[in-house]
């Protein structure tokens, strides 16, 4: 029987989700024996519909002179975009990092994998970041998050659901499941300790009272529901095809937990995902804003909506 990932251990879910969306890059033959999904091939029609990336300049003969490194769109898109450079922000919804770079969370982040969901990672060279250590090294250093938080951000379209790094250092699926089980126990114990309230914690005579966690915003609650839904899937045989996972709408929340004005579906089958505009507080569709495979310029419709509400308020006074 395959183990299940459910219950309070939602912190275990972002590694699986991020590696699905970012597309972990290549590894050795042993790594490819693990659970892999591949993006479907791009059709000639899809490639012909692609436009030059914003960083490309038109040459004298109409050819594009590209001053940036071109990488594939996030998800399973077929068009090219400019890769993120070393030191630039990166994450689930951003273009991939350039060759030789990976997307790492900031070393001081308490929830590194959630930070990558919000695009708060940084493109760095492999081995330069603190999170490039193996799970054992991180555990020996006393780090609380034993998964290490490392996420590859390469471009070959292979998606590894079970790993946070590539190359010969990868471990078999059996060992990773054991590591996930150990981490789940740590999270469960942490929740148990937090539920003790005013009791003495960790043997301290005068422990600080634990503050109740801040209320989850609607966007964060919706994201938690999506992660919970993924957690109830069996690993790995009932994970389902790639198209099924990409059919889930993953809300795009900002660092404050509000909805980003522009929400998009992930690219699939060589087509860009549709984008639409929502109210940052409620996530509801902004009336009159288009749903298109591109930039709907949500700020224009949101400002117009806010202006109309201001006029209505003045008339009521």
Swiss-Prot record:
Tissues where this protein is expressed: Expressed in abundance in selected adult tissues, namely liver, kidney, adrenal, pituitary and choroid plexus.
Protein species of origin: Ovis aries
Domain IGFBP N-terminal span(s) in chain numbering: 35-126
Keywords: Disulfide bond, Glycoprotein, Growth factor binding, Growth regulation, Secreted, Signal
Name this protein carries in UniProt: Insulin-like growth factor-binding protein 2
CDD domains attached to this UniProt entry: TY (cd00191)
Molecular function per GO: insulin-like growth factor I binding; insulin-like growth factor II binding
Post-translational modification: Cleaved by MMP9 leading to release of free IGF2 from IGFBP2-IGF2 complex, which contributes to enhance the motility and the growth of astrocytes.
């Amino acid at each position: 029987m395959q183990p299940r990932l459910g219950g309070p251990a939602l912190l275990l879910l972002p590694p699986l989700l991020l590696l699905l969306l970012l597309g972990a890059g290549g590894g050795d033959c042993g790594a490819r024996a693990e659970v892999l999904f591949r993006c479907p091939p791009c059709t000639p029609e899809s490639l012909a519909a692609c436009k030059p990336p914003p960083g490309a300049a038109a040459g004298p003969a109409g050819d594009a002179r590209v001053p940036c490194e071109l990488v594939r769109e996030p998800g399973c898109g077929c068009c090219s975009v400019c890769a993120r450079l070393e030191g630039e922000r990166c994450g689930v919804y951003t273009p991939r990092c350039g060759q030789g770079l990976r997307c790492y969370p900031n070393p001081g982040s308490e929830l590194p994998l959630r930070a990558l969901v919000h695009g708060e990672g940084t493109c760095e060279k492999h081995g330069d970041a603190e999170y490039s250590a193996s799970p054992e090294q991180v555990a020996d250093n006393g780090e609380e998050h034993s998964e290490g938080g490392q996420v590859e951000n390469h471009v070959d379209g292979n998606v590894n659901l079970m790993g946070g790094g590539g190359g010969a250092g990868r471990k078999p699926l059996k060992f990773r499941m054991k590591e996930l089980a150990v981490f789940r126990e740590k999270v469960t114990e942490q929740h148990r300790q937090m539920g003790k309230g005013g009791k003495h914690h960790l043997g301290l005579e005068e422990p600080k009272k634990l503050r109740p966690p801040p209320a989850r915003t609607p966007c964060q609650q919706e994201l938690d529901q999506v992660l919970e839904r993924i957690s109830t899937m069996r690993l790995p045989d009932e994970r389902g095809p790639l198209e099924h996972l990409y059919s889930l709408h993953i809300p795009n929340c900002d660092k404050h937990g509000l909805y980003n004005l522009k929400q998009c579906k992930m690219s699939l089958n060589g087509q860009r995902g549709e984008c639409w505009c929502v109210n940052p507080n409620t996530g509801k569709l902004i009336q009159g804003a288009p749903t298109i495979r591109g930039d709907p310029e949500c700020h224009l419709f949101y400002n117009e909506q806010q202006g109309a509400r201001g006029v209505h308020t003045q008339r009521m006074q």
